[in-house]
Amino acid sequence: MKQLGKHIILELWGCENQALDDQPGIEKMLVDAVKACGATLICVKTHKFSPQGVTGVAVLSESHISIHTWPELGYAAMDVFTCGEHVAPHDTIPEIQKFLKPEKIDVMDIKRGIIEVDEVKE
């Protein structure tokens, strides 16, 4: 069996409200998370909502990292989807924790593109 991608979904509760509404801080957190997991950054795009909330994505050569925040609830939803053997999506978690300071994190692991090795054409 071969796995084409690793996908973790993060549910972050009890985050610092100011961090969840800090667009430049979220951009930096995304860049730091990309470096931590060993991925290759293509670009980062974020959007600040009114009256509050930020959404953002780091586009990677290996896929993406995304975030959507609800400061009024102290909540953020994140996806870290990577392809390739050299990228470690779980290594993003300490960078995310350092910035958002969640009280609780739920992590869901999804194996993407499970195929039989003999199905892979060289």
UniProtKB/Swiss-Prot annotation:
Pyruvic acid (Ser) sites (modified residues): S63
Cofactor, free-text remark: Binds 1 pyruvoyl group covalently per subunit.
Keyword flag Methyltransferase: no
UniProt keyword S-adenosyl-L-methionine, yes or no: yes
Its biological purpose: Catalyzes the decarboxylation of S-adenosylmethionine to S-adenosylmethioninamine (dcAdoMet), the propylamine donor required for the synthesis of the polyamines spermine and spermidine from the diamine putrescine.
Record HAMAP family: AdoMetDC_1
Protein name: S-adenosylmethionine decarboxylase proenzyme
Organism whose genome encodes this protein: Methanococcus maripaludis (strain C7 / ATCC BAA-1331)
